[in-house]
Amino acid sequence: MSRIFLKLISIVFLISCSDNEEVQNTEIITDSYFFQKKVFNMNLYNCTTPIENVDSTYKKTSDSLNFYKFSELTEQDNQIASCTQTYTQINELTPLKSGLLLGLSYMELSNCNSKVEEELLLEDLAPYLEYLKENDVQVWTGISNLENNSFLWINIWKSEEYREEFLLEWINSDNSGKFAIALSSSARCQNPSTYLFL
């Protein structure tokens, strides 16, 4: 009796696992790649005088007044005389563009204030991030955790020229107004500082 029951179970299992070319299901994962997103410790220094003997793991501007490092391991580095240090954890939002963190980095950094909780802020950013992904925009984006409703928004672009071309197209598109309205209800950002790191 148990032998017949096992055969019956096996037949049902085989039928359910067999190929059926007529039925194809596609599952859309709304936050795909979430499991691949990284958190980086960022040390950023803005100095009043050039600093020449900077650790080689840092990228610096040509005038040696600004330098930064993203690291998954290193925590806050030491203070440096005549420099303002910013240390924070940056949550990667565009993991498919992490290759832009290598080589030259054209960084855009904005200080922002959130009007909503962090979860709602990320929900409001989702259409913008999806647009970047669908249109293969060459920008890496990350934000810091909220602290007293403040956060840093960082974009690292392929190049300064690429950023300028993208922004020119973006400003003249319907998307910019649509996303600006959605984001303005969640956060307000200051004009960004930009740096070319070597």
Predicted regions, residues:
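Sec-dependent signal peptide recognition
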Residues: S2-I11
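C-terminal motif of bacterial Sec signal peptides marking the signal peptidase cleavage site
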Residues: I15-S16
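Short S/T/G/P-rich N-terminal loop/turn motif that feeds into the first structured element of a domain
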Residues: N20-D174, S185-L198
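Outer-membrane beta-barrel domain signature
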Residues: D174-A180
